[in-house]
Each structure stands twice: as structure tokens, then as C-alpha cells.
Amino acid sequence: MARDEKTIFLFDVDGTLSESRAKMPEKMGKMLESLRRKVRIGFVGGSDLAKQKEQVGDNILEIFDYGFPENGVSFYKNGTLESQEKIIDVLGEEFYKEFANFVLRYLSDIDLPIKRGNFIEYRNSMINISPIGRNCSREERMKFFELDKKEKFREKMVTAMRDRFKDSCLVFSIGGQISIDCFPKGWDKTYCLRHIKKEGVENVYFFGDMTMEGGNDYEIYNHKDVHGISVGNPDDTYRKVDQALKKIGLGGLEEN
């Protein structure tokens, strides 16, 4: 059966193809290899390409037809960088300084059992904020994640930032287990759709884990031009990819 060039299966990385900040299982690599024979495939995530390589592999751009690091602000096609933009060109240095100062003051007042380093991470597409600090260990990450479910540290901080910067272009969403994504309106994961539309794709299937309101998959999951599929972990992603293929008449993952 010839590949359906009108259809793309688009994947979040963290929590979807791999467990949070962990290596992608070999099973998922084989899934992508099988899937690519049936439809176009792409990945989209808020992290930069270096972090996505840590999880998927150094050959990530060879595995996928399309790569959308930093929500598609960086756009790769067949392994080649096609375009890239920078958030600082939108925000300006003065606003960014004001924003960073507010964030650092706010974080200094949060009482956590432990704090590590890298509380603000500047990326081309967003500012990523972590109350515990992105340098925390995996064990510390999980402890913060469980504590945050009860204490709502990130939810409260998002509310404070929305109030303080309500007249700005910034949007705030809870990302992954330890952080908050801050980006210009429209620079969420739906940003990648502007590139996909130019590729002759008619059917977009998106798989992501943070699809709840306030999660960083919410906007693309609910976009009118996207078939959004919510997943709980890589094993769930595998099952739902298989189900989606059968539903659109392309056979399951093992049927090549």
C-alpha cells in the first residue's frame, strides 16, 4: 500500500513518545519506522532540538519527515532547517528584563523543600520557568510534581503572571512536570500548523499528554483542523496510533 501523503501523525515528545525527560523506548522507535511507511510523521515540542535529541536520539531528524522544536518556531524538513524565529524580537529587551525580574522575585517567595538551578530558561520560542529549577534530579522532579498537584504552585504562579502582564502578548501554560511555558499568543504548538499547511497535508492527527485546559498540548489538541488524541504514556500512544491507523483504513502497525 502506498503511503498516504495527505495525512500526518504529529507527536508531542515528553510524556508521549517517552516518559518525562527519559529516553524513548525501543518499541516506540520501531513504531515510528512502521508508521512512516503509511503516513507522514512529525514531532512538535516546546524544548529545543538538543533536549529532544536526548530523549529520541541524535538521529531524530532522520526518523521524522518534519521536526518542530520549540513549537515549530524552528522548522526542519527532511533533516534541514527551513526557518527559525526568536521571541526576543517580539518582546524586546526592556520587556523581557521586566518580566524576568518579576519571575525571579516571585520564585524567591515560593517555599519549597528544595530548590536547584536553572529557574528561567530562555529559548527561541518561549521562556520556560521552573519553581524547583530544571537542574533537579529525576527523583526530585517526581517529588515536586506530586507536591505541585496538592499545593498548585505552578497554577498560582500562572494566575499571578496573567494578572501582572495582562496587557502583554504573553500566554502562559503549565508544561510537563516542573515548568511553565511563557510565549507570545499564537506561539503554542499550533504554530507548527502554518508550516504543515504549506506541505499539502489535509489530515493532521496529533498525539499528546498535556491536553487538559492549561496544559501545553491543549491548543493544538482542540484546534479545528486537527484530530486530537490524548494519551497517558508511550504505551498508550502505541495503542492509540494502532487504533487510529485502523480507523482510517491503513491497517495496524504490524500490517505493512
Swiss-Prot record:
Pfam family, one: PMM
MF GO annotations: metal ion binding; phosphomannomutase activity
Subcellular location: Cytoplasm
UniProt key word Isomerase: yes
Keywords: Cytoplasm, Isomerase, Magnesium, Metal-binding
Primary location class: cytoplasm
Residues that, per the record, bind Mg(2+): 12, 14, 209
EC number: 5.4.2.8
Binding site for alpha-D-mannose 1-phosphate: 21, 123, 134, 141, 179, 181
Reaction(s) the record says it catalyses: alpha-D-mannose 1-phosphate = D-mannose 6-phosphate
GO biological process assignments: GDP-mannose biosynthetic process; mannose metabolic process; protein N-linked glycosylation
GO cellular component terms, semicolon-separated: cytosol
Pathway field: Nucleotide-sugar biosynthesis; GDP-alpha-D-mannose biosynthesis; alpha-D-mannose 1-phosphate from D-fructose 6-phosphate: step 2/2
Record-linked InterPro entries: HAD-like_sf, HAD-SF_hydro_IIB, HAD_sf, PMM, PMM_cap
Source organism, top-level taxon: Eukaryota
UniProt keyword Oxidoreductase, yes or no: no
Residues forming the catalytic site: 12 (nucleophile), 14 (proton donor/acceptor)
Summary of the function given for this chain in its UniProt record: Involved in the synthesis of the GDP-mannose and dolichol-phosphate-mannose required for a number of critical mannosyl transfer reactions.
Subunit relationships: Homodimer.
Family: Belongs to the eukaryotic PMM family.
This protein's name: Phosphomannomutase
Species the sequence originates in: Encephalitozoon cuniculi (strain GB-M1)
Annotated gene: SEC53
